[in-house]
Amino acid sequence: MQPIQIAIVALVVAIIIAIVVWSIVIIEYRKILRQRKIDRLIDRLIERAEDSGNESEGEISALVEMGVEMGHHAPWDVDDL
């Protein structure tokens, strides 16, 4: 192979690696943003429960829509056996 062909192949490989790495970064960033949104909703829910004595149905339904279940956060810490 001539040097120009080696350079072109190296450039293509570098571009493919960059695309894969940035795809992984974007996926992880979206996960972090989703987790922050869930954490904010849970914090608001806890704050409202402390203030009013009951939980807000709107925020619980928003968490359920996102796939977050409320309940025991640590399944190994259950005292109702």
Swiss-Prot record:
This is Protein Vpu. Residues 28-81 are cytoplasmic. One of its GO terms (biological process) is symbiont-mediated-mediated suppression of host tetherin activity. The chain crosses the membrane at residues 7-27. It is found in: Host membrane. The gene is vpu. Ion channel activity is inhibited by hexamethylene amiloride in vitro. Its main location: host cell. It comes from Human immunodeficiency virus type 1 group M subtype B (isolate BH10). The modification Phosphoserine is found at residues 52, 56. GO terms for molecular function: CD4 receptor binding; monoatomic cation channel activity. Signal peptide: none annotated. Belongs to the HIV-1 VPU protein family. The N-terminus and transmembrane domains are required for self-oligomerization and proper virion budding, whereas the cytoplasmic domain is required for CD4 degradation. The cytoplasmic domain is composed of 2 amphipathic alpha helix that form a U-shape. One of its GO terms (cellular component) is membrane. It comes from the Viruses. The keyword Repressor does not apply. HIV-1 lineages are divided in three main groups, M (for Major), O (for Outlier), and N (for New, or Non-M, Non-O). The vast majority of strains found worldwide belong to the group M. Group O seems to be endemic to and largely confined to Cameroon and neighboring countries in West Central Africa, where these viruses represent a small minority of HIV-1 strains. The group N is represented by a limited number of isolates from Cameroonian persons. The group M is further subdivided in 9 clades or subtypes (A to D, F to H, J and K). Homopentamer. Interacts with host CD4 and BRTC; these interactions induce proteasomal degradation of CD4. Interacts with host BST2; this interaction leads to the degradation of host BST2. Interacts with host FBXW11. Interacts with host AP1M1; this interaction plays a role in the mistrafficking and subsequent degradation of host BST2. Interacts with host RANBP2; this interaction allows Vpu to down-regulate host BLM sumoylation.
